[in-house]
């Protein structure tokens, strides 16, 4: 089977009425799946449905500074996700970014294959259909484009599409702007802990004896979720937490993102002029669990294509030791909940756990006479 035939987009375009078994989620996962459009419509019609918090951070630069810090702190602690208004990302830049990403995915699959990655060889960046193994052994209903977007001098620009021509300049512009936004949010989140505003960013970057520090890394992943004939059986991205410190998300207006809160899945609504921000594992570790790395997933739709742009803000892979901030453990305030690890070690440990869970699931299935798909 060729790479083109392996792409989820190719399956969608083939007008199949069923989906291959490797995309059918386990029975226990399917109880609350459904068409993203229908699920979002039901949530919108339910006046009592929980809503992800909306926080305007433009107030941080004015008289509303204290209230802004408190609102962000509460959202990070109670939800681990929030809609951010007043983020300072110009609407025209976001429109150009969306247009460029959608134009890339509108290209023939064979043309996109020029940027194909090779996870088996350790090359995760590029165009692909799966980033990592999962516990169930099932595949996700998405294709994607994944590459470093900041700092620019570390990026492999051979993975940045030459077509459309707008892709490179707008992605570079967007990456720099999100980097500035990340610093602002980390400052607000530091103050929410009762610590100096530079604390979290400083601990996410390396400082050696010469005062030199590594920059934060921003990875851009464009998720492309084609139409799916059985959205009640498949997911775009399965339930997971991000390994990053923060994740910034915008989309093409089609719903699908869900966050797990208080024992239920809450659908992210379309909040005009906002972007979604997730707290990731790295920040949860630094704050010793005060800020929550949100469990989330993405549904798919029978009638609509969903595209989302996610920027993962990450510490350098090996030069920073992630561990709970000592300031939060002082004077017997608490015990560390996380062992010290580099970011690379954390990612590897999480991947190993996924593989181990999959092996255990396969072994259990085999013992019951079931052949894992």
Curated annotation (Swiss-Prot):
InterPro entries: DIOX_N, IPNS-like_FE2OG_OXY, IPNS-like_sf, Iron_ascorbate_oxido_reductase, Oxoglu/Fe-dep_dioxygenase_dom. 2-oxoglutarate binds at residue 306. Fe cation binds at residues 240, 242, 296. The keyword Oxidoreductase applies. Its EC number is 1.14.20.4. Belongs to the iron/ascorbate-dependent oxidoreductase family. This is Leucoanthocyanidin dioxygenase 2. It comes from Oryza sativa subsp. japonica. The gene is ANS2.
């Amino acid at each position: 089977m060729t790479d083109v035939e392996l792409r989820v987009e190719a399956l969608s375009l083939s007008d199949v009425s069923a989906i291959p078994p490797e995309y059918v989620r386990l029975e226990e996962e399917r109880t609350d799946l459904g068409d993203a459009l229908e699920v979002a419509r039901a949530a919108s019609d339910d006046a009592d449905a929980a809503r992800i918090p909306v926080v305007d951070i433009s107030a941080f630069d004015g008289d509303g500074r204290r209230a802004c810090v408190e609102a962000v702190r509460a959202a990070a602690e109670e939800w681990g996700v929030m809609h951010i208004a007043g983020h300072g990302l110009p609407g025209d830049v976001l429109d150009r970014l969306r247009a460029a990403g959608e134009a890339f995915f509108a290209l023939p699959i064979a043309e996109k294959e020029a940027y194909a990655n090779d996870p088996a060889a350790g090359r995760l960046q590029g165009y692909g259909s799966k980033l990592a193994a999962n516990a169930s052994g099932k595949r996700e209903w998405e294709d994607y484009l994944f590459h470093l977007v900041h700092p620019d001098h570390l990026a492999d620009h051979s993975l940045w599409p030459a077509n459309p021509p707008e892709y490179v300049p707008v992605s570079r512009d967007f990456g720099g702007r999100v980097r500035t936004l990340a610093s602002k949010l980390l400052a607000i989140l530091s103050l929410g802990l009762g610590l100096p505003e530079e604390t979290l960013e400083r601990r996410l970057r390396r400082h050696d004896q010469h005062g030199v520090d590594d920059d934060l890394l921003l990875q851009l992943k464009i998720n492309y979720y084609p139409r799916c004939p059985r959205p009640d059986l498949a997911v775009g991205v399965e339930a997971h937490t991000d390994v990053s410190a923060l994740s910034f998300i915008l989309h093409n207006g089609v719903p699908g993102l869900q966050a797990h809160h208080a024992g239920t899945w809450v659908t992210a609504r379309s909040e005009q002029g906002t972007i979604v921000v997730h707290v990731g594992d790295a920040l949860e570790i630094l704050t010793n669990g005060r800020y929550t790395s949100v469990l989330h997933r993405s549904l798919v739709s029978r009638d609509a294509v969903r595209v989302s742009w996610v920027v993962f803000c990450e510490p350098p892979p090996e030069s920073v030791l992630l561990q709970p901030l000592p300031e939060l453990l002082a004077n017997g305030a608490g015990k560390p909940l996380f062992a010290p690890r580099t970011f690379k070690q954390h990612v590897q440990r999480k991947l190993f756990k996924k593989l181990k869970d999959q092996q255990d699931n396969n072994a259990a299935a085999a013992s019951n006479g079931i052949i894992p798909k």
